[in-house]
Swiss-Prot record:
Involved in cytoskeletal rearrangements required for phagocytosis of apoptotic cells and cell motility. Acts in association with DOCK1 and CRK. Was initially proposed to be required in complex with DOCK1 to activate Rac Rho small GTPases. May enhance the guanine nucleotide exchange factor (GEF) activity of DOCK1. This is Engulfment and cell motility protein 3. PANTHER family: ENGULFMENT AND CELL MOTILITY, ENGULFMENT AND CELL MOTILITY PROTEIN 3. The keyword tRNA-binding does not apply. A motif (SH3-binding) lies at residues 696-706. GO terms for biological process: apoptotic process; phagocytosis. Residues 307-479 form the ELMO domain. Pfam families: ELMO_ARM, ELMO_CED12, PH_12. One of its GO terms (cellular component) is cytoplasm. It comes from the Eukaryota. Keywords: Apoptosis, Cytoplasm, Phagocytosis, SH3-binding.
Amino acid sequence: MAPPRNVVKIAVQMSDAIPQLIQLDQAKPLATVLKEVCDAWSLTHPEHYALQFADGHRKYITENNRLEIKNGSILCLSTAPDLKAQQLLGRLQNTSREGCCEVLRNLVLLASDMTFAQEVISRDGLQKLSTIIENGDDLGEMLALGLRAFLELMEHGVVSWETLSISFVRKVISYVNMNLMDASVQPLALRLLESVTLSSPALGQLVKSEVPLDRLLVHLQVMNHQLQTKAMALLTALLQGASPTERKEMLDHLWKKNLRQFIYKNIIHSATPMGDEMAHHLYVLQALTLGLLEPRMRTPLDPYSQEQRDQLQALRQAAFEPEGESLGTGLSADRRRSLCVREFRKLGFSNSNPAQDLERVPPGLLALDNMLYFSRHAPSAYSRFVLENSSREDKHECPFARSSIQLTALLCELLRVGEPCSETAQDFSPMFFSQDHSFHELFCVAIQLLNKTWKEMRATQEDFDKVMQVVREQLARTLALKPTSLELFRTKVNALTYGEVLRLRQTERLHQEGTLAPPILELREKLKPELMGLIRQQRLLRLCEGMLFRKISSRRRQDKLWFCCLSPNHKVLQYGDVEEGAKPPTLESLPEQLPVADIRALLMGKDCPHVREKGSGKQNKDLYELAFSISYDHGEEEAYLNFIAPSKRDFYLWTDGLSALLGSTMGSELTRLDLEQLLTMETKLRLLELENVPIPEQPPPVPPPPTNFNFCYDYSITEP
């Protein structure tokens, strides 16, 4: 007879004792279960004991999480969390240095458990740890363990970072600024200051004023991957918390100190693979640097500004020899004005007053900056562009000014200038760190590409929008390749000619047109079920392989990893925390289990509980696109297992796999593309024998019925 549903078979261990195999009734109070376990081992005072999971992070079992115990779980009997916290904190003050280190190791091991952390915090554990950190009697292992334990406790969000004292923060700052310091201490101190900066504006100002940027640059130059990452994390946190003016001053100082060159040579091109956290911080640094262009992008040209009028005149004079100077100064004001209007027209401005062209925002004054940069840093290319087009047949000239304005707006859109930083994105461009003034240099390449494409298309003024569409495709495709230098970008984008773009479009069109004939459509419909089954099988295999996901803390920072996979029999999801840099764990080592039968539904995007209350700003768009959750039965309540996919592809693979597991439709864009690719391949294989045979749009006509249905059978014929 099968046991009741609320009864699970488990094992309970204790050191120096024979394990117990028991049937745990989940309806029975946990105190009663503990008493029965203690009685079996003749232990008194069951209130001094608690149950923990034997594997993973040894989480304490409470009434809130006891439903996580599944059939086959292995538990261990240990000291109750309140008593354990009291014992450890008592020993922390009354033991030698070696004893304190041992206590701190235990605190670090147990602090990730919320139940234990609350007991430590309620007994002024944070205050005791802060005393160890502030005293700084030992600048080695003991201090590192104290910082780690303090961080683990604070990560639970029970205590606000804003409650930290100024003296404590200053002491941690001193560890960052100290020259001779244990290598394990400074990454932890930097991590703590990053959390303080992101969570408390007031304390963030203290960190900004007392941690010199040059000190962070020193940490970045140390060939220690963890130290580099945490230094970059604090640097981007300080930049995000600064005002626009302060941010510009800070970035100018960093560039003067050759930070860009160091990142390009020693981080991007390092022999050690770049971690996800460093990639995110480089993305943030790139976004903040490009964000300095936003004020110019949002500001229209002021026709009453003498400086801006002089810049326009300098742009004109760089392209044309001032006719008034070559012929003397005898030109009247009207004649000189007429010459200026004509030359501005040759430059490609649509209006007689060029200020009217630059009133559009975006790109505003940023377009003028780009044109001036091109004229000053590539004067021969600039003169050739303008003079070549001013001498072309009417309507075939490529308007430089109009093209520059449109192209600047396009580059701002492709590079997301002025958009808030995503909290999960990692898609920085290595090319950005290979060149000073990368945006303006990119414009110089793009404007010459536009002129080249214009000539290849033999375009007229009426074709301007078509040319811009082709240039957009050329730039977007090349940027997606993430070239590591501007020269490599130039080579790749120039290789993507208008003819190549046409070829790609034609290929795509032929692929589409080849599947529109009714007989082909009918064949595709017959093939779909089999191919969908193949895709379903592949998605489930990806779930069985498992994947590393990042946890998002209360401050939305991704700093911890966990692993999840599907069992080979497709009946259980197994998961658990893993350390950074560790190999993916085996199925047997994962402590947590979620039976597929307990899953209620799959939630995606804004429906997920871990992103539902984060607002609707642009900075959350990427997070919504990568978030999904599983709702499952947790006793009488509904619980959630929350995920943030590393990439859009992984999001599609996992949501498809979970949908297939639950018997739902796999409706992702990736499934549609995979199905289309498989259908195309299978259809071509089926039609190989029909090469050069035209397939009719309609099936052959059905012949008319006979005049009558009076059939005759000759019985004289002997059947064999």
